[in-house]
Amino acid sequence: IYTLFVPMDASLAFPCFDQPDLKARFTFAAETPESWTIIGNADAVKTELVNGKRQTQFAETKPISTYLFAFAAGQFRQIAGSKSPTPLRVFVRQSKLKRAEEEWPEVARLTDEGMKHFVEFFGHEFPFTKYDQVLLPGFAYGGMEHAGATFLREDAILFRTTPTQSDKYGRASLVLQELAHQWFGDLVTMRWFDDLWLKEGFANLMAYHAMARIYDPAQMWRRFYQSHKP
């Protein structure tokens, strides 16, 4: 199970103002079946088994918009990523673990390189305590940049058929765009939803900015132009 409150549905789950420039610190605890893993915006600070159930308490978040609060819970398996300077992890269904382990090196490289590039280019450290990527089957979007925990549509990362190079570039664009949103959209947020275009446009641009560092720059900017020209 997972949440998806964008753009203004957090108030369906708890009393709040779904206004993006009104930010709050969230504390969150949940009880799940023992075999489940739960992922939230912040780190889990306490986990214990009580009467066959797993109780998890998360650290308080930094100030975030209500639409960026999220959790996902289920029989996920974790693929460990780098731990410095920001912990990077991927969570995937058990049935897709082998496939994810095959694709993880490339996704990890994109995330690592993107993280370094954005920290350097923005002149600001990663704004949250960790960065998780959770692969979800049938997710409504290609990705959603919840603070510290991006949710990605599973088949956008784990291809169902042999991918073309264009498919791989598309995946790179998605991974890097959602990562860029952690700064522009999550850390810095528009006043109201009529300016969604600003954060989306900027994150898309920055995805290609990072791709131009990772891949051939001329080819990436040509791809950017061809995919965005009127």
Please state what every model-predicted region is.
Residues 58, 90-230:
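Hydrophobic alpha-helical and helix-loop surface patches within well-folded domains
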Residues 1-130, 155:
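Acidic/His-enriched low-complexity segments
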